[in-house]
């Protein structure tokens, strides 16, 4: 049997699983999904978790079930492409015939001094929880600065306005307008 190993249970590898399972799964293949957590996280909804308008349960989706789908939970320590093996921090070795790496992204502070130490994040469920707790502890009238006026920044600002209308929310972006990846007409509408 061939072993297709999927590193990461994010959107890309979930799409692969949902396309293959249950009807397009080659008979000679098993799939091993490796992730830190036993569920898929709806990362595009973390802003609502941070703002307190959504719960952990609402941003989690169970991985699909299939007799030839094995789920392994842990941290990846290395990949040996010559030996075709993935190594986990707990010592587990996972051989593969084909490998898909879909491990997601991390916050990028663009070299801004102090940004990592003095900002909060919504990149993971755990970081979104911390952000929520900090926001809950702010007294009325506090200023919340959101760095990044793309979709996540705008969504977070909107949800915060709903859950904490007593806060002053300021958006900062390096672009002269919000939602720079979208048509200017939409950007202007959202700004108003």
What is the meaning of each model-derived region?
Residues 1-70, 155-184:
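Beta1-alpha1 glycine-rich phosphate/pyrophosphate-binding loop at the start
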Residues 1, 68-144:
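FAD-binding core/adjacent interface of flavoenzyme oxidoreductases
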Residues 117-192:
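Predominantly flavin-linked oxidoreductase catalytic cores and closely associated redox partners
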Residues 27, 45, 65, 75, ...:
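Glutamate identity and glutamate-enriched acidic tracts
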Residues 12-22, 83-93, 146-153:
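Short, mixed-charge, low-aromatic patches
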Residues 7-9, 101, 147-148:
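Conserved N-terminal Rossmann-fold NAD(P)-binding element of oxidoreductases
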């Amino acid at each position: 049997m061939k072993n297709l190993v999927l590193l990461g249970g994010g959107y890309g590898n979930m799409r692969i699983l949902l396309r293959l399972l249950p009807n397009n799964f080659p008979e000679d293949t098993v799939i091993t999904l490796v992730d830190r957590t036993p569920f898929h996280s709806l990362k595009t909804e973390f802003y609502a978790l941070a703002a307190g308008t959504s719960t952990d349960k609402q941003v989690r989706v169970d991985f699909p079930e299939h007799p030839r789908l094995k789920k392994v939970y842990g941290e990846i320590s290395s990949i040996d492409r010559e030996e075709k093996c993935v190594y986990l921090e707990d010592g587990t070795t996972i051989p593969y015939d084909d490998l898909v790496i879909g491990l997601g992204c991390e916050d990028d502070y663009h070299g801004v001094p102090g940004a990592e130490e003095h900002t909060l994040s919504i990149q993971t469920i755990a970081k979104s929880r911390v952000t929520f707790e900090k926001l809950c502890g702010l007294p009325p009238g506090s200023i919340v600065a959101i760095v990044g006026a793309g979709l996540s920044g705008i969504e977070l600002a909107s949800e915060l306005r709903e859950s904490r209308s007593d806060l002053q929310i300021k958006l900062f972006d390096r672009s002269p307008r919000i939602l720079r990846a979208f048509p200017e007409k939409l950007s202007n509408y959202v700004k108003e």
